[in-house]
Amino acid sequence: RSGALPAPVPAHARKRPVESDESDGSLDACVLAKELGYTGVSSKACKGVYRSILNRARCAHWNGRAGEERYFMSAEDLIVQAGVSLQQDLSLATIIGCTHGERNGHHYVNGLAGAPREEQTRVLNAYPNLYRRGDDGIVRLSIRGGTIALGDLATIGFGSRAEI
């Protein structure tokens, strides 16, 4: 984080979209990154919902001034656990208009394996398109053809309608 932002993006790299990603360590990091030639910033729910919304507004404002869609946001989850935190992270990505996202948590965490079976069933019943039960009985994020169905999250409660 400390090594990336002090240096400007080299001229040859400015021909492509370059994202500040891990350097987004403060509320003004996105502004500093833009001044250094970065055109993108990542949204991570763990860094705060309001920061993502603020950065999305910044990108929209800068794009309006530039007259083109130059500035962008990506959605990343680091290691978000299945359940409410994943659902809210996906909801945030949708709110700020990210149609593609990097999902890592499902590679490192075994879905809802740590939750009692009854809780897993309640989550699966509340979000039947977002999760699936594996052959081993564990409820996990359902990824089909590289996509995640988000329709179950279009509900009151910022992605958390299940009684857990």
Tell me the role of every PLM-derived stretch.
Residues R65-I164:
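Flexible C-terminal active-site loop/helix
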Residues R1-A75, V84:
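Catalytic core of soluble alpha/beta enzymes
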